């Protein structure tokens, strides 16, 4: 999951932000995470997290340089139709928060569930 977040940070979202800003109504290709599974399979989690953190810092700095009006820039999305940069930024946050929830569930399952013994029986995991 960390490799996916790292890859999405640089090769999907940042690329799209740049296209929103530099092109007039760019057309985006569908993003298919399945086609990158091999790339993620053997990734080192610490390296992926470090790469993600570096890219996130760079992306936040870049986003802060954009004028507020950039949020109204438009693009064409293959499934959603015409979208604004502002909408994509909200989707980016939802994407990341969804994966953070999954990571938290995996930590809960692997580190705490068994150690809780019978007290853990009433918990349902949703990774």
Residue ranges and their predicted role:
Residues 1-31, 60, 74-127:
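Short, contiguous alpha-helical
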Residues 34-73, 87-92, 100-102:
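Acidic/histidine-rich alpha-helical segments that form the ligand environment
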């Amino acid at each position: 999951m960390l490799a996916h977040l790292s890859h999405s940070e640089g090769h999907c979202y940042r690329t799209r932000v740049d296209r929103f800003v530099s092109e007039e109504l760019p057309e985006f290709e569908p993003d298919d995470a399945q086609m990158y599974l091999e790339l993620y399979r053997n990734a080192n989690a610490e390296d992926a997290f470090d790469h993600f953190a570096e890219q996130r810092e760079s992306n936040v700095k870049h986003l802060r340089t954009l004028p507020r009006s950039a949020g109204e820039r438009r693009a064409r999305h293959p499934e959603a139709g015409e979208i604004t940069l502002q909408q994509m930024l909200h989707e980016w946050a939802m994407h990341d928060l969804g994966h953070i929830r999954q990571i938290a569930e995996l930590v809960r399952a692997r580190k705490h569930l068994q150690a809780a013994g019978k007290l853990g029986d009433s918990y349902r995991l949703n990774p």
